Amino acid sequence: MALAMLVLVVSPWSAARGVLRNYWERLLRKLPQSRPGFPSPPWGPALAVQGPAMFTEPANDTSGSKENSSLLDSIFWMAAPKNRRTIEVNRCRRRNPQKLIKVKNNIDVCPECGHLKQKHVLCAYCYEKVCKETAEIRRQIGKQEGGPFKAPTIETVVLYTGETPSEQDQGKRIIERDRKRPSWFTQN
């Protein structure tokens, strides 16, 4: 049979004592259960401890509470700030040039509607107009089809008032709108 051996190195840090004591108690509870069905050896685990003998004894809780302090209890107090930041440090941190809002130099005027927009980006006002017109066309198509899954597999052409279908539009589905064609909606 193999002899179990545990080596503990004790630090002068007071929170480490509680942590080591908890691990030692847990180890003592788990050892008899570690090999069910096999007789336990007549000897216990060998322990090498550098420090006072109080670490090898289980902690007797006099308050009646059975809660053991865990490793997290000793870590949470370490994460708390120990000193207050000075006002100079706070101002430097808050007014850091990397954190300030950058000035945009790529603002342009939309040539269609005159609203402000970013360069190389579609104008939000014009995009909203296109979305509304597209939604109206889709609503009209839905009324003609009578259902969402009854669309024919042919190409669709949108005609506005005063427009007639061309020779290229023969055999295509034609949607007629009761208004003038918008300037931004090309016929092709």
Curated annotation (Swiss-Prot):
Bias type Basic and acidic residues, positions: 169-181
GO BP annotations, alphabetical order: mitochondrial translation; translation
PTM field: MRPL32 precursor is processed by the m-AAA protease (composed of AFG3L2 and SPG7), which cleaves the N-terminal transit peptide. Cleavage by the m-AAA protease takes place prior to assembly into the large subunit, an essential step for mitochondrial ribosome (mitoribosome) assembly. Proper processing by the m-AAA protease is dependent on the zinc-binding region within the tightly folded C-terminal domain of MRPL32: zinc-dependent folding halts degradation initiated from the N-terminus and triggers the release of mature MRPL32.
Entry-linked SUPFAM superfamilies: Zn-binding ribosomal proteins
Subcellular compartments: Mitochondrion
Pfam family, one: Ribosomal_L32p
Ligand binding (Zn(2+)): C110, C113, C123, C126
Entry coiled-coil feature ranges: none
UniProt entry keywords in alphabetical sequence: Mitochondrion, Ribonucleoprotein, Ribosomal protein, Transit peptide
Chain intervals for the UniProt region annotation (Disordered): 164-188
Single Gene Ontology MF annotation: structural constituent of ribosome
Keyword Manganese: no
GO cellular component, one term: mitochondrial inner membrane
Family listed: Belongs to the bacterial ribosomal protein bL32 family.
Function of the molecule: Component of the mitochondrial large ribosomal subunit (mt-LSU). The mitochondrial ribosome (mitoribosome) is a large ribonucleoprotein complex responsible for the synthesis of proteins inside mitochondria.
Subunit structure, interactors included: Component of the mitochondrial large ribosomal subunit (mt-LSU). Mature mammalian 55S mitochondrial ribosomes consist of a small (28S) and a large (39S) subunit. The 28S small subunit contains a 12S ribosomal RNA (12S mt-rRNA) and 30 different proteins. The 39S large subunit contains a 16S rRNA (16S mt-rRNA), a copy of mitochondrial valine transfer RNA (mt-tRNA(Val)), which plays an integral structural role, and 52 different proteins. bL32m has a zinc binding site.
The name this protein goes by in its record: Large ribosomal subunit protein bL32m
Source organism of this protein record: Homo sapiens (Human)
Source taxonomy: Eukaryota, Metazoa, Chordata, Craniata, Vertebrata
Gene this protein is translated from: MRPL32
